[in-house]
Amino acid sequence: MQLTSFTDYGLRALIYLATLPEGELTSISKVTEVYGVSRNHMVKIINKLGQLGYVDTVRGKNGGIRLGMPANRIILGDVVRATEPLQIVNCSEDFCHITPACQLKGILASARSAFLAELDKHTLLSLIDNNPPLLVLLDRPVTE
């Protein structure tokens, strides 16, 4: 299953925000610079993540963005469910004439469930915890 770029960059943005000291603000521009992503696309992503409570957005001269909840409470499967259209195939009878006899839909639904179940085992914190190479790649300080 391939994630949309929206979900992919949303997860990447959350990873970057999770590497910041608690409460520290950064800018959307910084996140786009780190990942080389379109600022307009990232604004839409951060807006959605903000609506979902994963990101706090602070307006004003000293504003910015930061995680909206502790990284250990952000479950990857929940983020994917909230940002990803999870319909793998269109199985309506109008679209496919074998729908009444097809077993593929059930198999794909099981595969999607297994995919999400694996993501449910991991939090945002588990991606960054004890991962100095990631911190180096994100140009974040590595603490011993």
Curated annotation (Swiss-Prot):
Keywords (A to Z) from UniProt: 2Fe-2S, DNA-binding, Iron, Iron-sulfur, Metal-binding, Repressor, Transcription, Transcription regulation
Which sequence ranges form a coiled-coil region, renumbered to this chain? Answer: none
The free-text note explaining how the cofactor binds reads: Binds 1 [2Fe-2S] cluster per subunit.
Q: One GO BP annotation here?
A: negative regulation of DNA-templated transcription
The record, for Gene3D superfamilies, names: Winged helix-like DNA-binding domain superfamily/Winged helix DNA-binding domain
> Entry's InterPro entries?
TR_Rrf2-type_CS (IPR030489), Tscrpt_reg_Rrf2 (IPR000944), Tscrpt_rep_HTH_NsrR (IPR023761), WH-like_DNA-bd_sf (IPR036388), WH_DNA-bd_sf (IPR036390)
Query: Would you name any one GO CC term?
Result: cytosol
Q: State what protein this is by name.
A: HTH-type transcriptional repressor NsrR
The organism of origin for this protein: Photobacterium profundum (strain SS9)
Question: What taxonomic ancestry is recorded?
Answer: Bacteria, Pseudomonadati, Pseudomonadota, Gammaproteobacteria, Vibrionales
